[in-house]
């Protein structure tokens, strides 16, 4: 697993990226720079089959990528962490926090997409596409961001064992969710459903009326920095 770690004080921050993205993205870089100015520790990494990490993207599953995140928490961090998850990373963040609750002092979800393999991909495919996936094992899905993305039968089937939005999510740490209302990949009301599903009483959800899925332009990055700063301050206040 390729990673970049900036040493610093606690709580640390661990950034978990999206489906087929990598740790060099705009949000990861902007938040790393901000957290460094704040003197907190920061880790960003690539899941297997992503970016600079080994493996093939089409071999990946939600279980594999969540294990990658847990491994990063175990090997590269100590003490309380604020987990930041973008898109699919929001699902990975929740799974990692459930696996290592002592590490998860807070969470910041950016267009968080828990259960997206089932409720966004599979639910959005027509019968012919579903048949192709079941028969051929893969569907090359067109992407707005570059080459088609291989959506595999394993990704869909294995993802079903990690679905979180069917019941209460037993996490009690503070959570901040940021969601654009012009997001064409994650419906904005998904953030409200996640707010309801989380057991935590300390959940704040920010809807950005003109925000898209990426939330990577200047004003959006300012909002992310502001929310992360508030959350880190809150966690630091609780810890002292």
Where are the predicted features?
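Catalytic histidine-centered segment of alpha/beta-hydrolase-like enzymes
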Residues: 211-223
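Conserved alpha/beta-hydrolase
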Residues: 32-54
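Acidic catalytic loop of the alpha/beta-hydrolase fold
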Residues: 182-186, 213-214
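The serine-hydrolase catalytic nucleophile loop
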Residues: 19-32, 189
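Alpha/beta-hydrolase active-site loop
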Residues: 59-75
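Hydrolase active-site cap/lid region
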Residues: 103-150
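Short alpha-helix in the alpha/beta-hydrolase fold that links the catalytic acid
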Residues: 28, 173, 187-196, 220
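Short beta-strand/loop motif that positions the catalytic acidic residue
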Residues: 170-171, 177-179, 183
């Amino acid at each position: 697993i390729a990673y970049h770690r900036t040493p610093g004080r606690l709580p640390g921050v661990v950034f978990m990226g999206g489906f087929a993205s990598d740790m060099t993205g705009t949000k990861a870089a902007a938040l790393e720079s901000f957290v460094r100015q704040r003197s907190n520790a920061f880790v960003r990494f690539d899941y297997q089959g992503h970016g600079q990490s080994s493996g093939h993207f089409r071999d990946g599953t939600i279980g594999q990528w969540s294990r990658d995140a847990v491994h990063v928490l175990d090997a590269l961090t100590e003490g309380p962490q604020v987990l930041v998850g973008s898109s699919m990373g929001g699902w990975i963040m929740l799974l990692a926090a459930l696996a290592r609750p002592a590490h998860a002092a807070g969470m910041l979800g950016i267009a968080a997409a828990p259960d997206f393999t089932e409720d966004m991909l599979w639910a959005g495919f027509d019968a012919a596409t579903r048949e192709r996936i079941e028969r051929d094992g893969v569907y090359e899905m067109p992407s707005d961001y570059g080459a088609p993305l291989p959506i595999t039968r394993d990704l869909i089937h294995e993802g079903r064992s990690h679905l979180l939005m069917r019941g209460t999510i037993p996490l009690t740490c503070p959570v901040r969710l940021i969601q654009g209302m012009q997001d064409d990949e994650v419906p904005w009301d998904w953030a409200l459903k996640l707010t309801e599903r989380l057991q935590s009483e300390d959940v704040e959800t920010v809807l950005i009326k003109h925000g898209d899925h990426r939330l990577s332009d200047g004003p959006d990055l300012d909002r992310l920095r502001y929310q992360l700063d508030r959350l880190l301050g809150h966690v630091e206040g609780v810890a002292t």
